[in-house]
From Swiss-Prot:
Keyword vocabulary terms for this entry: ATP-binding, Disulfide bond, DNA replication, Early protein, Nucleotide-binding, Oxidoreductase
Record site feature (Important for electron transfer), residues: 743-744
Binding partners and assembly: Heterotetramer composed of a homodimer of the large subunit (R1) and a homodimer of the small subunit (R2). Larger multisubunit protein complex are also active, composed of (R1)n(R2)n.
Designated name of the protein: Ribonucleoside-diphosphate reductase large subunit
Phylogenetic classification of the source organism: Viruses, Duplodnaviria, Heunggongvirae, Peploviricota, Herviviricetes
Amino acid sequence: MAAAHLGMPVPVYMAEREEDLALRKLIDTLKISAGWDLEANRMAGRLYHFVMGRRAPVDTRAYVTTFGDKLEKGVHRFLWDNARDIDDLCKDFQNGPEYERLISRGMLSAKRMYDTYVLRTEEGGGEGAVYESALQMYARMAAFFTCQCFAYPSLRKTVSEVEGGSGRMESGLDFFAYFFKILASQLVSCATPVMRSAGLRQSYLASCFIMNPDMSTEDKTLSAVFRDLSPLLCSKSGVGMNLTNFSSGGKNVQSCLRLINSQVEFCNDKNLRPVSVAAYMELWHEQIEEFLAAKLPENPERCQSIFQGVCVPGLFFRLYEQNPDSQWHLFSPKVGGHLAGLYGDKFDEEYARLVRHGLYSSSLPAKSLMFALISAIIKTGSPYILSKDAINRHHWFETQGNAISYANLCAEVVQQPHEFTSTCNLANVCLPACLRARGEGEGAGAAGEGEGADRLSPLTPDLEFCFDTLRAAVRAAVYMINASILGGVCPTPGVRVMQAERSAGIGVQGLADVFAKLGRGYMDAESALLDARIFEVMYYQAVRASNQLVTVGGAPPHANWKNSKLSRGEFHWESWGVQYDSLFIERQLWEELRESVTKHGTFNSQFIALMPTAGTSQLTGLSESFYPFYANVSSKVSNKEEVMKPNITFLERVSPSDVPLLKYHGGDVSKLPPPLAAKYRNFLTAFDYSPEDQIRRAAARSPFVDQSQSFSFFLKEANVKSASYVKNLILLGHGLGLKTIMYYCRIQKQTSLTALECLQCTESPDSGDGVGGYKGGDEEPRSPEHAQCESPDRCLSCQ
């Protein structure tokens, strides 16, 4: 400020820099109370958007000039040619209430936006870096989707005729405005690869990949790990990888897992968006015990940067339930490898034949393997548990002889890659955006075609759930996913082959917020009813929109349409035994859709997949996925700082006079005195609800989730002192037919809501009391985010 002392004018850039420093100090001050002060949290977020907005280009022309070398040619040209109109559209949006909501999601939302999602001119985001603003990011995405519509006439025609209202959408700006409004209002959130890379040159937009490589020899194993896996990790996406056929000349599977682990760690070095691999193995493999031990804390060479999953045949569960001392036999893939292709009765028959002829490598009591499985779960939070019978019985085509025994990184996408590489293409609907003031818009009608709202809450008569908005969101998600499939780059030839099946996965976020805003608890009967209706409508609308791409747009059905169950008119929910009288949507509408689908086909092979959404839920400030609230106050810890993560829906309803007591108990409603506990009962967390009830709720929505759901166990520390408790949950999930019986096991310590850790269990799953069977874990306590997994951001691709 020497110039000022000499009476000289201060340069504008110096004044702005000093103002930014002052604002950052104010932000740091507000962050201290952001956990309990809703306005402080919102103000900190607004100010952070303001500060970072100064580092963004001033208008669209300046944006294209700054980032033009990164933009795909068509997107570059569209933004440049329509710059003035786009500026006007963005300005109108900024002057409306939706922009205020966008920048008022809190400090964590703003930090996440600029740390992870927006473009910058310097990868590290240095002092001189120029950033996209939030609206410029959404404009880039909208421009990409618009360009794909004009590149693919079927997409353009469908969007124009279905979304055009009384008149068709004709100009590029019409399409841009349609996509921009949905994205910027956060009605639909795309997966992280799309948010970061849509519209860029040579952009990888797939969320996750699934591999089933041949690992029967040393050469083939090395080829799978270095030739096939490496390009997928370098594309910054997560991978699900089947290891069931690993034999590799007698080598130990842990050495293979360490190879994979090292690749993941290398790719994550200096990487803004960490990636990982979920390795899957079936329970009959001769090295299953070594596989389960690969991540245990007592293993000096544990593979802490990857994840594991097991696929369990129904036969194992039945043997265990009949007699835990029954012998379970393990096989070499060279002898029993064909078991991998079988499920149900065919698996049972072949397993029995191999045992009868003494072709097994070894055997052990079923309870010993169950204990090894549960011990790994309690110590590490995984492996994921898939039901082999369920994922194959309910798959979109018959898999007997080539059965599926693996999933993607977050266990919600189930596909058969054959000798190629399957791809996940994801988006999620922000369900609270479907709430509206009662009486607005259409009246009640048939759920499939004009249902106005679901009126469930006399306690909060000002809000109702609008199925019109939900259907519009699902249609938009279908268009965006298909634009990403058609316009993205495939990292390997195998990915390109499987993209022809055009598998889509539409999920949700904010389900718990919807129930709370309607004045209901997560487990209330009315909430359960709305839960099932939401996913029925989503499945119906996704199939219908995909069918319209064929009937309206003239696109061909996906590559494997003739082999699909839908080609025979079989909806996913019918394989669950669901009858018309239990459905929300009228029978006539389902039958009309069946007729159209059978006659014309669908553009996509799959439709609904419920992913975790941990990343995009931070952008919106909503609860994750379909889960109950995880905590009412927690924090997000990164290598830079700790940012408070309050439950915004909770804070909006907290009386100021109740804050001291709520703060004393860390927002834990279950610890409040009875009157206050009753007042805030709608904000109980996932740890407060019965895990059995959560499993039943997951089973109730399963008929409408044609892929799977990242269903997790939320357990209190006292529960896992008895391994039999976890065992019973697994058996219940199997009995109710869940495809993903368990994605992750989160354990809440009794001492503190925000200090969670994995525990060590040393008692048998068949001992009931667990007395003396538990010892404290030797890992340090973790924040809520770190309780979920060792690498909390590893599933950004799915979010």
